[in-house]
Amino acid sequence: MTIYQPRLTHIALHVEQLDECIQFYQSFCQLYVSHERASGNKRVVWLSERGREHDFVMVMMSGGHNLPPPEGDYRHLGFAVASKEEVDRLAEKAAEQGCLLWPPRQEPYPVGYYCGVLDPSGNQVEFSYGQPLGSGSPAA
């Protein structure tokens, strides 16, 4: 019998503004809807990176409530980007849309250069460059 190590395959978020969240993750993260279904009177949507549909998805479910994190809470979803300029571009876009949370900043390795953005349901999203994570990392 083969024993498999647990592997992270998805994160599920119950959100209040499903369509706005879909649009946000499509616009900021280039995710696309890889699956959608109704579940009773609620909708369930899987958002994926192209080519990773069977590796990792973000599941979004309608009918949730915005739950802003407590003051000083740093929980977030992290996305690696290709350059510091891309971090700056996303931060500028977020500022224009009124959802910039943390302006770009440089931290010592392994944190790198990053900014923070709020999605329409109040989830914190980090865009970073220079971390040893993701397909574009120096360690990959």
Residue ranges and their predicted role:
Residues 34, 55-56, 102, 125:
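Generic structural signal for well-ordered beta-strand positions
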Residues 21, 25, 87, 94:
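Hydrophobic pocket/interface hotspot
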Residues 1-4, 7-16, 67-140:
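Vicinal oxygen chelate
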Residues 54-62:
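Conserved segment of winged-helix/HTH DNA-binding domains
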Residues 45-49, 60, 79, 115-117:
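Short beta-strand element of the conserved SAM-dependent methyltransferase core
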Residues 1, 61-67:
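Short beta-strand/turn micro-motifs at beta-sheet edges
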Residues 3, 12-55:
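Core segments of cupin and vicinal oxygen chelate
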